[in-house]
Amino acid sequence: LKQVIFKADDFGLSPAVNGAIELAHREGVLDGASLMVGARFAADAVARAHRLPSLRIGLHLVVVAGRPVLPASVVPALVDASGEFSQRLARAGFRYFFLPAARRQLAAEIRAQFEAFRATGLPLDHLDAHHHLHLHPTVLGLLIRIGREYGLRAVRVPHEPPGLALLANEPGRWGRWLSALLLAPWIALVKYRLHRAGLRTTDRVVGLHDTGRMTATRLLKVLQTLPAGSTEIFCHPALSDAEGPWPLAVAASRAELDALLDPEVQALITNLRINHGGFCDLPHPKT
């Protein structure tokens, strides 16, 4: 049995992103999206989500490269002079691990983002994090503890297994294979902690190394080579009139939207009898 979750990140970032996510769910294969509760266009994203009750919405936790939900004066150890989280992941990770004040403020900010999500009235399908920073041990521990209070049931574990990288048979696959191999012990520990807390995860994730390149051709190849079990396939779609602080080239994000709408992709899912839905459709973890 193959179970796939097609998911988009950065819901709320811009009208072009929000519109692409709505279109990809209405007319394509997109199952869910991750909401940036502090983003400028989060309210627009929430309104769209309420019109689409079958779209599974999760929390896209932002604790780096963005703005906090709490006032900067409440979390001074987390932000720079402009009130933004650090753009430097290593620096942020160091502070979150070693500075007690940063850890206390980080806990408060994570709680505030869960509160903001709860205020939307949307069911919480899952959690992931901007730049995958929930793999950081401090962030991971806090989201498990705090998330329990807000009904958190599933978390993305961003790891593409080594074997899947080789199956891709593409340039750079050996580098992807080595990266996945080196991360495997830490990923196993992350999954153990999540499963021990009763949180669901997929068996694997696809898209981690393909940001901006999840085209229809790539998606068809992935679907044909997927092993049995559960897989999250995530992407960053946007309409061709993308605006604002969008990290991808407009053509790349439009290509990812086109992949989600592609009739061949939809036909292959049917022909291979692939089930797709949300994180909360996954079985409870075995501990």
Regions found by a protein language model. Give the residues of each.
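Active-site histidine-anchored catalytic micro-motif
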Residues: A129-H131
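DG-centered beta-turn motif at the end of beta-strands
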Residues: A8-G12
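Terminal accessory/targeting
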Residues: L1-I5, P15-H126, P137-T287
